[in-house]
């Protein structure tokens, strides 16, 4: 298991933008991670004060960070950065609210040079919250 210290070693993100709390499962091309969503998240102050919902774009960012942990934990990529290059087929199916535990899965489906394509999904209580195909570039 990869803990928060390992995650912080791999990713440059820090509070309030670090959106991966723990890695539950990891292999060469697949990763499962979690984010504990609490009422203390800064985005809930404005989205929405009387009905707090995690913004969909931040769910996708959490998925991208999940994939980033996998890629940046590899010896050949240590010290590099991962940059978003695109999102396709993104769907939001369930609202993510305070108290939810977001389970994020990313599977690499294609790599060419410094470009990678990932199928990603986020679930809450076994129900699909969001999914999509993410493309990113690995830079130095």
Curated annotation (Swiss-Prot):
Catalytic residues (positions): 47
Record's catalysed reaction(s): a (3R)-hydroxyacyl-[ACP] = a (2E)-enoyl-[ACP] + H2O
Keywords: Cytoplasm, Lipid A biosynthesis, Lipid biosynthesis, Lipid metabolism, Lyase
Xref: NCBIfam families: fabZ, PRK00006.1
Gene Ontology cellular component annotations, sorted alphabetically: cytoplasm; membrane
One GO BP: fatty acid biosynthetic process
Family, per entry: Belongs to the thioester dehydratase family. FabZ subfamily.
UniProt EC number: 4.2.1.59
GO MF annotations, alphabetized: (3R)-hydroxyacyl-[acyl-carrier-protein] dehydratase activity
Function: Involved in unsaturated fatty acids biosynthesis. Catalyzes the dehydration of short chain beta-hydroxyacyl-ACPs and long chain saturated and unsaturated beta-hydroxyacyl-ACPs.
Lipid biosynthesis as UniProt keyword: yes
Gene3D superfamilies, sorted: Hotdog Thioesterase
InterPro entries: FabA_FabZ, FabZ, HotDog_dom_sf
Protein's name according to its UniProt entry: 3-hydroxyacyl-[acyl-carrier-protein] dehydratase FabZ
Intracellular or extracellular location(s): Cytoplasm
């Amino acid at each position: 298991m990869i803990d928060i210290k390992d995650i912080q070693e791999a990713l440059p993100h820090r509070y309030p933008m670090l959106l991966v709390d723990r890695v539950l499962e990891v292999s060469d091309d697949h990763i499962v991670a979690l984010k504990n969503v609490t009422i203390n998240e800064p985005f809930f102050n404005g989205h929405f004060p009387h009905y707090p919902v995690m913004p969909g774009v931040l769910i996708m960012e959490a998925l991208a960070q999940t994939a980033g942990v996998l890629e940046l934990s590899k010896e050949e990529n240590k010290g590099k950065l991962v940059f978003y290059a695109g999102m396709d087929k993104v769907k939001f199916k369930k609202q993510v609210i305070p108290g939810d535990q977001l389970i994020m899965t990313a599977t690499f489906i294609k790599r060419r040079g410094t470009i990678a394509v990932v199928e990603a999904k986020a679930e809450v209580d076994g129900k699909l919250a969001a999914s999509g195909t993410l493309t990113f570039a690995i830079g130095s």
